[in-house]
Structures are given as C-alpha cells and as structure tokens.
C-alpha cells in the first residue's frame, strides 16, 4: 500500500512537471514573438494604423456622439476592409452621423451610403434598430458594459471589447478578430478552433497589460506580413521559431546578424512537501535570452 502511494505521488509530480514546462515554454514563445512583431511593426504603416475604427469618429463631437460614431464604425467593420469602412464612415459623417440622423434615414438611402461595406443591407437595418434602442433606453448614449453592448443588434464580443476600449477607455477583454485568431494559432501560442475560444485562451496566457495592445499589434501584422494567403515568411523575424513558417532556413539578401532578446517571466513551481498530500507553490523569476537571426541594413 505504501509503495503504491509513493508511485502515485511520483507520477503526479511528473505530470505536474511536464505541464509546468509546457506553460513555461508557451510564455517564453509569446513574449519572444511579441517583441519581434513589435520590432517589425515599427517599420510598418498598416491600414489599421490610419483607417482603423479608433481613427474614424469625429474627435470634436460631443462625447455621446463620439461614442456612437465609434460604435457605428465597429458595426460596419466586420467583413469589410479598413479602406472601405473609412470611406463609408466619411459619407455618413458628411450627412451628420448621430443617433437622430440615422433614425431620419430611410433604409434604402442608408444602404446607398453604406455600399459597398460587407453585408451593407443587413447593417443598415442593424444601425436603425440600434439607434432606436439607444434613444429609447440609453438616453442617446451607448451602453457602458460588455453585456449591454453585446445585446445590441449586430454587435459581437470583438466589437463590444473594442467599443469598451476606444469609447469608454476600459479594457475588459481581448478583442479577437480573424487576424488575432489566425496569428496566435500559427505561432503556436494556443490551439483553438474559434475566435471565442481564442479569446478565452489568450486571456489566460497573456497578462492583462497586453490585452488591449495585442489586437492592434496583430491586426497590423496580419494585414502587412502574416496574411491569410501567402504570408511573407521569408522576411518575417519569427520565421526561425514559428511552427507554421515556410521559410525557417531562408536567408535574406542582406547579411544576417544575431539579436538577443531578454524575456522576463515569472514561473510558478509546484512541488510535493515531505508531508503527504501537502503542496507548496513558490514563484521564481527567470530571465531567458533568446537569440534570433535578424537582417542588418547594408
């Protein structure tokens, strides 16, 4: 009986050790990749940087109007390129984009303004329904909670999280769109099948300080470098460690040099105490230096 108990403890410890190693490796991976992506993004001007939804509302409008415009921009953004969305928002603002103005439009006229936004006919209806709800139930403003925003027609979790961040200045979750979902899985940070599952997984993996910037960072990276089709793996700084890279051994025409990136992390160790069935957790800080091949300027 005693030996059997000992075997169980040893087996349990082994499983815990493997799990700890897996988590530690994933933490090192995403921290390394984020630093490399930030380095690449410094030289990129992506559509999201100049035409993202955070750029489309009138900064001089009254706060409730500004918040409504942020909401509208995000409602139009799904299945729509930033350039098309920005143009549609300009047309709406030229007509005076407010709750009252949206309610004055006839649906066919609103459709004409929104076209060629993706699903513009459906979104025209959503906009009018949302405007009526905001007028009747929110005194002409937008909800200030995630649940309240998600209850509006045509508003999902990604939009709601971005509205909270942009309009209310509050980050309550990670906004996961197709770029964030694709890239975080390509890099091997997580293994998920839907954006909703990706959000939950990333919110466990990433510290809250990264929840807001990760969307903008990965969206721009996905637009310019890690595209859905034919990603530019040959010039990506993550290509040597990315499990999805098609160019792990590809050298650029310029000379390669080495760059060391120090990744700081806290790792929680779990071990068995001498007393049976008593576990102790300790936190230790580690530093990992990762050498990544990058390209020097000629």
Swiss-Prot record:
Main location: nucleus
Organism: Caenorhabditis elegans
Binding positions ([4Fe-4S] cluster): 226, 233, 236, 242
Knockout-associated phenotype: Increases the total average mutation rate 17-fold. No significant abnormality in lifespan or sensitivity to oxidizing agents such as hydrogen peroxide and methyl viologen (MV); due to the redundancy with other DNA glycosylases.
PROSITE patterns: ENDONUCLEASE_III_1, ENDONUCLEASE_III_2
GO cellular component: mitochondrion; nucleus
Cofactor info, note text: Binds 1 [4Fe-4S] cluster. The cluster does not appear to play a role in catalysis, but is probably involved in the proper positioning of the enzyme along the DNA strand.
EC numbers for this chain: 3.2.2.-, 4.2.99.18
Record field: catalytic activity: 2'-deoxyribonucleotide-(2'-deoxyribose 5'-phosphate)-2'-deoxyribonucleotide-DNA = a 3'-end 2'-deoxyribonucleotide-(2,3-dehydro-2,3-deoxyribose 5'-phosphate)-DNA + a 5'-end 5'-phospho-2'-deoxyribonucleoside-DNA + H(+)
Cofactor(s) of this protein: [4Fe-4S] cluster
UniProt-annotated site: Important for catalytic activity, residues: 177
Regions of compositional bias (Basic residues) in chain numbering: 278-287
Keyword annotations: 4Fe-4S, DNA damage, DNA repair, Glycosidase, Hydrolase, Iron, Iron-sulfur, Lyase, Metal-binding, Mitochondrion, Nucleus
Stretches for region Disordered: 249-298
Thermal dependence: Optimum temperature is 26 degrees Celsius.
Protein family per UniProt: Belongs to the Nth/MutY family.
InterPro entries: DNA_glycosylase (IPR011257), Endonuclease-III-like_CS2 (IPR004036), Endouclease-III_FeS-bd_BS (IPR004035), HhH-GPD_domain (IPR003265), HhH_base_excis_C (IPR023170), HhH_motif (IPR000445), NTH1 (IPR030841)
UniProt xrefs under CDD domains: ENDO3c
Function summary: Bifunctional DNA N-glycosylase with associated apurinic/apyrimidinic (AP) lyase function that catalyzes the first step in base excision repair (BER), the primary repair pathway for the repair of oxidative DNA damage. The DNA N-glycosylase activity releases the damaged DNA base from DNA by cleaving the N-glycosidic bond, leaving an AP site. The AP lyase activity cleaves the phosphodiester bond 3' to the AP site by a beta-elimination. Primarily recognizes and repairs oxidative base damage of pyrimidines.
Catalytic residues of the enzyme: 158 (nucleophile)
Keyword Hydrolase: yes
Ranges of residues in domain HhH: 138-165
Gene Ontology biological-process annotations: base-excision repair, AP site formation; cellular response to hydrogen peroxide; depyrimidination; DNA repair; nucleotide-excision repair
Biased composition (Basic and acidic residues): 288-298
Name the UniProt record assigns to this protein: Endonuclease III homolog
Protein localization: Nucleus; Mitochondrion
Phylogenetic classification of the source organism: Eukaryota, Metazoa, Ecdysozoa, Nematoda, Chromadorea
GO molecular function, one term: 4 iron, 4 sulfur cluster binding
């Amino acid at each position: 009986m005693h030996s059997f108990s000992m075997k169980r403890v040893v087996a349990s410890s082994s499983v815990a050790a493997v799990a700890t190693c897996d988590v530690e490796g994933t933490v090192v991976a995403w921290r390394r990749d984020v630093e490399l992506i930030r380095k690449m993004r410094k030289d990129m001007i992506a559509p999201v940087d100049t035409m993202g939804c955070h750029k489309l509302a009138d900064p001089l409008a009254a706060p409730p109007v500004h918040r409504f415009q942020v909401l509208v921009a995000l409602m139009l953004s799904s299945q729509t390129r930033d350039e098309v969305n920005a143009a549609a928002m300009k047309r709406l603002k030229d007509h005076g984009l407010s709750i009252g103005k949206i309610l004055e439009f006839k649906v066919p006229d609103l459709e004409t303004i929104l076209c060629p936004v993706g699903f513009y006919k459906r979104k025209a209806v959503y906009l009018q329904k949302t405007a009526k709800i905001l007028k009747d139930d929110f005194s002409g403003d937008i909800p200030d909670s995630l649940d309240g925003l998600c209850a509006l027609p045509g508003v999902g979790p990604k939009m709601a999280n971005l509205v909270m961040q942009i309009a209310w200045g509050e980050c309550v979750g990670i906004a996961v769109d197709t770029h964030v979902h694709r890239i975080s899985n390509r890099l091997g940070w997580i293994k998920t099948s839907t954006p909703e599952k990706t959000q939950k997984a990333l919110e466990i993996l990433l510290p809250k300080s990264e929840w807001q910037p990760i969307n903008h960072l990965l969206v721009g990276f996905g637009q310019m470098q890690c595209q859905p089709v034919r990603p530019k793996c040959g010039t990506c700084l993550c290509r040597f460690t990315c499990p999805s890279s098609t160019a792990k051994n590809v050298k650029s025409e310029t000379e390669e040099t080495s760059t060391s990136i120090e990744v700081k992390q806290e790792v929680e160790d779990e071990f068995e105490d001498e007393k049976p069935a008593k576990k102790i957790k300790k936190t230790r800080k580690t530093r990992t230096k990762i050498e990544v091949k990058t390209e020097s300027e000629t």
